[in-house]
């Protein structure tokens, strides 16, 4: 009986904790010469759906086999939730694959929202020889 009462709360606590943990390293495969957006970030104040300035994105570990750059653009928020499809300023991490091999890069994202704070991410890009 006690387990039935606790289970929904335990599930909610675990889901919240999982959402708060930093993202694990991700992997993507590209061909030499390809250009890809590895990550895009925006920030919306949820209470009134106000689009805030794009989060500050900075590279903390540069790739060895390709080039990475930070681009500022405008885009749309996700397609779900109360603030869906809002036009927002976006920071993007763009990677250009040069040499074949496994390349790793890392970056951090600084949000205006103190709860989100600064988040750190990394990615491994596998580059295969181009055509």
Model segments located where?
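Bacterial N-terminal signal peptides
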Residues: 11-20
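Beta-strand-rich extracellular modules
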Residues: 108-112
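Extracellular interdomain linkers/hinges and stalk-like, low-complexity segments
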Residues: 25-62, 114-131
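Surface-exposed or secretory-pathway low-complexity segments enriched in glycine-proline
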Residues: 49-87
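Extracellular/luminal low-complexity segments enriched in Ser/Thr/Pro
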Residues: 92-102
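A generic structural micro-feature
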Residues: 84-89, 99, 117
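N-terminal secretory signal peptides that target proteins for export/translocation
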Residues: 1-7
């Amino acid at each position: 009986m006690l387990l039935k009462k606790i289970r929904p709360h335990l599930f909610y606590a675990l889901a919240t904790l999982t959402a708060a943990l930093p993202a694990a390293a991700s992997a993507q495969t590209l061909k030499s010469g390809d250009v890809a957006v590895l990550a895009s970030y925006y920030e919306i104040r949820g209470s009134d759906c106000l689009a805030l300035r794009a989060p500050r994105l900075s590279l903390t570990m540069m790739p060895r086999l390709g080039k990475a750059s930070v681009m500022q653009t405008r885009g749309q928020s996700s397609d779900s939730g109360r603030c869906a499809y809002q036009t927002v300023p976006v920071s993007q991490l763009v990677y250009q694959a040069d040499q074949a091999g496994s390349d790793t890069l890392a970056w951090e994202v600084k949000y205006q929202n103190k709860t989100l704070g600064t988040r750190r991410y990394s990615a491994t890009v596998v580059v295969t020889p181009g055509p």
